[in-house]
Amino acid sequence: MNVLSCSINTLNGLYDLSGVEVGQHFYWKIGGFQVHGQVLITSWVVIAILLGSAALAVRNPQTIPTGGQNFFEYVLEFIRDVSKTQIGEEYGPWVPFIGTMFLFIFVSNWSGALLPWKIIQLPHGELAAPTNDINTTVALALLTSVAYFYAGLTKKGLSYFGKYIQPTPILLPINILEDFTKPLSLSFRLFGNILADELVVVVLVSLVPSVVPIPVMFLGLFTSGIQALIFATLAAAYIGESMEGHH
């Protein structure tokens, strides 16, 4: 009961935290909802980059791949390896989901360092990487949660919920709490790392605007790629865990 009360208090605290804003934001009204316009703009740019790259890669496929086709086939093989390692032999249907997560986060993270967002002026706020906004990372984490629940229910039916009393019913509250901590850890890890990286670069550029920030930017690109890989790997691991039923 204490664990349940703690979970409710944690959710209430997160709801209150969602009302806290850092800096200024450019809002749009869509269907009665207020959304962050700059996040939608940058997300659409990232999606356009991914769709455009995919269209170019499959425009004229060759039996012996060269150039861009070779690169994209390597990326696909890499995503397949990650999915197979974490999910197992039934990884096939989940490759598109894991690949979409990885590529969207990867390009979003890199866009914060490589695209000149600052030159686009908004009435309020400024453009930045989509993953620099907690709303984006929480949405990605919730999609992952829906995916592993769907995977478990599809594979096992209602018997999937038996995992909550394994290995002993005493662990029921902890096993339930785990389903809240997974999306929290995914979202805050990604958001915190990307936000910290962009803040460090901004501070260094303002202090020493010539040479010093360049190594930090390269380090940021490396860590951004690692964060995308970590997110995709954990998403695949959670899906595999729900299908196998072990911790």
Curated annotation (Swiss-Prot):
<comment type="subunit">
    <text>F-type ATPases have 2 components, CF(1) - the catalytic core - and CF(0) - the membrane proton channel. CF(1) has five subunits: alpha(3), beta(3), gamma(1), delta(1), epsilon(1). CF(0) has four main subunits: a, b, b' and c.</text>
</comment>
<keyword id="KW-0472">Membrane</keyword>
<dbReference type="InterPro" id="IPR023011">
    <property type="entry name" value="ATP_synth_F0_asu_AS"/>
</dbReference>
<keyword id="KW-0793">Thylakoid</keyword>
<feature type="transmembrane region" description="Helical">
    <location>
        <begin position="95"/>
        <end position="115"/>
    </location>
</feature>
<dbReference type="GO" id="GO:0005886">
    <property type="term" value="C:plasma membrane"/>
</dbReference>
<dbReference type="GO" id="GO:0046933">
    <property type="term" value="F:proton-transporting ATP synthase activity, rotational mechanism"/>
</dbReference>
<feature type="transmembrane region" description="Helical">
    <location>
        <begin position="134"/>
        <end position="154"/>
    </location>
</feature>
<dbReference type="InterPro" id="IPR000568">
    <property type="entry name" value="ATP_synth_F0_asu"/>
</dbReference>
<dbReference type="GO" id="GO:0045259">
    <property type="term" value="C:proton-transporting ATP synthase complex"/>
</dbReference>
<dbReference type="GO" id="GO:0009535">
    <property type="term" value="C:chloroplast thylakoid membrane"/>
</dbReference>
<protein>
    <recommendedName>
        <fullName>ATP synthase subunit a, chloroplastic</fullName>
    </recommendedName>
</protein>
<dbReference type="InterPro" id="IPR045082">
    <property type="entry name" value="ATP_syn_F0_a_bact/chloroplast"/>
</dbReference>
<keyword id="KW-0406">Ion transport</keyword>
<feature type="transmembrane region" description="Helical">
    <location>
        <begin position="220"/>
        <end position="240"/>
    </location>
</feature>
<keyword id="KW-0066">ATP synthesis</keyword>
<keyword id="KW-0150">Chloroplast</keyword>
<feature type="transmembrane region" description="Helical">
    <location>
        <begin position="199"/>
        <end position="219"/>
    </location>
</feature>
<keyword id="KW-0813">Transport</keyword>
<keyword id="KW-0934">Plastid</keyword>
<comment type="function">
    <text>Key component of the proton channel; it plays a direct role in the translocation of protons across the membrane.</text>
</comment>
<keyword id="KW-0138">CF(0)</keyword>
<dbReference type="InterPro" id="IPR035908">
    <property type="entry name" value="F0_ATP_A_sf"/>
</dbReference>
<keyword id="KW-0375">Hydrogen ion transport</keyword>
<keyword id="KW-0812">Transmembrane</keyword>
<feature type="transmembrane region" description="Helical">
    <location>
        <begin position="38"/>
        <end position="58"/>
    </location>
</feature>
<dbReference type="Pfam" id="PF00119">
    <property type="entry name" value="ATP-synt_A"/>
</dbReference>
<comment type="similarity">
    <text>Belongs to the ATPase A chain family.</text>
</comment>
<keyword id="KW-1133">Transmembrane helix</keyword>
